[in-house]
């Protein structure tokens, strides 16, 4: 997302576009970046419209959708049509379990509130005297990653393999809870230390862990 947006901004300034046109290009670039990364043009379009422009005008929708579709075509041409997650064939969910879906949605909503709160307050945490140097912030994140590499290695990385494994195997409630807590905190730590990165994919993993946790608890 960031690479696509920055590339679009650079192209805009190279071509001498106006500020308004540059905003449209940045939105289109971000949409193309997400669409290419996940082979998901619709997700890229909706993300850019909701997060960057917060409106659905045709002037924004058409270039954003065009860039997302074009990026997906190019990505599939070079890397194939495999998606980020490879779920097995799923059976239809019985209607008597629909309340579980609603409960998962509510739980993810509350988790999002807590995550946003933590994200906004990471500056206060990294503002402690011990983190006065930027290197200390990065060292703390690396130390946390090292601990997790020996204790919960599934938490590290993008999380694609973890989500795939959740769909194919069953884990105990305690292990899932540990994975969720570790992924939640480590995402905040790694993003807050200032190293360039994102939390879009980690949020998908957190949502999958919440669903697996409640599925293990309720079903």
Can you annotate each of these PLM segments?
Residues 1-219:
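Alpha-helical transmembrane segments and immediately membrane-proximal extracytoplasmic
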